[in-house]
Curated annotation (Swiss-Prot):
Pfam short name (any one): PRK
GO biological process: coenzyme A biosynthetic process
Stored Gene3D superfamilies: P-loop containing nucleotide triphosphate hydrolases
Signal sequence interval, chain numbering: none
The protein, known as: Pantothenate kinase
Localisation per UniProt entry: Cytoplasm
Pathway stated in the Swiss-Prot or TrEMBL entry: Cofactor biosynthesis; coenzyme A biosynthesis; CoA from (R)-pantothenate: step 1/5
GO molecular function, one term: pantothenate kinase activity
Source organism per UniProt: Nocardia farcinica (strain IFM 10152)
Keyword field contains Kinase: yes
Amino acid sequence: MARMSEPSPYVEFDRKQWRTLRKSTPLVLTEEELIGLRGLGEQIDLEEVAEVYLPLARLIHLQVAARQRLFAATATFLGEKHPDRQVPFVIGVAGSVAVGKSTTARVLQALLARWEHHPRVDLVTTDGFLYPTAELTRRGIMHRKGFPESYDRRKLLRFVTEVKSGAEEVCAPVYSHISYDIVPGKLHCVRQPDILIVEGLNVLQTGPRLMVSDLFDFSIYVDARIEDIEKWYVQRFLALRKTAFADPDAHFHHYASLTDEQATLAAQEIWNSTNRPNLVENILPTRPRATLVLRKDADHSINRLRLRKL
């Protein structure tokens, strides 16, 4: 554990230091399960799960228990009966496009669901709260898709508020990466989860009004050098030509036939016009708000972590 020369609300770890905090937490994922959770281009293996994610799962498990004691104390103060069900613990996972936050969220969901005290763990991405393409076009912000203003932030806030308030069922819209739009009539519903993970680009943003980040009990920022993220984005774009882009119904099907050189230029254009500006202007400035920062090296491996202790 790194010692700070100046007073700081953070404590920093290298991977060797962090892995000792796993204690006796068992590894409950198999290689086959991990393959199903791993995103395109991700290199995560069982060793990283054991050394990075198991200590994290243990920390969150301890914080879930502590948060429930806090809610019980507040109920006692108010003279209220303690609720039969625990208040859902909400985790935010933020980071750039192509940094691997979706894989982080899925692995965390799988690990946390193995703990007997919180077996119901739901994962929702903020993609479902993007405005439909027709609405983005009407507002003249289709080119700003992924920027904060392209999301229905009120709907997202209402969704998380209702989940945390104990509503029996709360439903979110579903986004398709094939059609590049909200799927009409399709919903993803959660039913009183013990833990809710909310994953998205801008989930840690703040503002003058109540924001979804104000409802998080724990938050994670997946970090890396901008140059590395750009490289991963281009690599993923090239790989998608043979998967999602190959579907004739895909919004980006016209990219499927590009040569490597053409696809690289197209990916760099999208990165420089949209993803990099969004990262620099909106996403990266929210990093200090995270409870935990996971820092990736150029090979995708997590080797440094920064935990907010205050």
